[in-house]
Amino acid sequence: MEDGAPYGASVRESLVHVLDTARELGFRTENMDGHLGWCEYGEGDEMVAVLGHLDVVPAGDGWSCDPFGGELRGGKIWGRGATDDKGPAIASLFALAALRDSGLPIRRRIRILFGCNEEAGSDDIKYYLANGGEIPVMGFTPDGEYPVINGEKGIINVTFSHANVQTGDVRLLSIHGGTAPNVVPAHACAKLACPRELAQRLANL
């Protein structure tokens, strides 16, 4: 593991870029050892959090453009994470700048959290809390839909195993599919040992 890059160099690069942008916009920032970063605007004892994240699920195959190129087509940005969650996170940053520039008075600080491990279990938030990260009085994620979604209730990753006891003419040699636990597999592959006639029938399905 690289220093300051607990979730990989590319995620660290995204975090450094967004925090640099936030500083250029005039916001206070903090980088929590590459696990998570935040920027903040306003004064007051209480804080409202906007929880975004910069990591993405694996890009997979079948793209007609560079999945990390941010290509603009028809007024839309195409790329992995454009809607979940880089686009909403950056939109929140510029919305915060617009709010500040409007001069509208606010009673609480607004902090945008830029997570780096949401897609793989949210260890970034655990690190934030374990290292003195302030708990907000309220918060929301910017990538939801209407009507309001009242929180995800959790995730369970399960590993199954079974003794390789097989009889008959068909034997399963291997099976695999998918790139991450929270991604619908684009394809799956099974390797079978079976009589040639059956293999031909399967090939003709």
Regions found by a protein language model. Give the residues of each.
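N-terminal helical capping/dimerization or prosegment-like subdomains
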Residues: M1-L51, V57-A59
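Generic non-transmembrane alpha-helical segments
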Residues: H17-L25, A98, R201-L205
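Short, internal active-site loops enriched in acidic
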Residues: H35-G37, C116-E119
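Short hydrophobic/aromatic beta-strand micro-patches
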Residues: E40, G115, A193-P195
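Active-site metal-coordination/substrate-binding segment of hydrolases
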Residues: M47-F114, A120, V137
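Midchain, well-structured core segments that form catalytic/ion-binding scaffolds
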Residues: E119, I125-L205
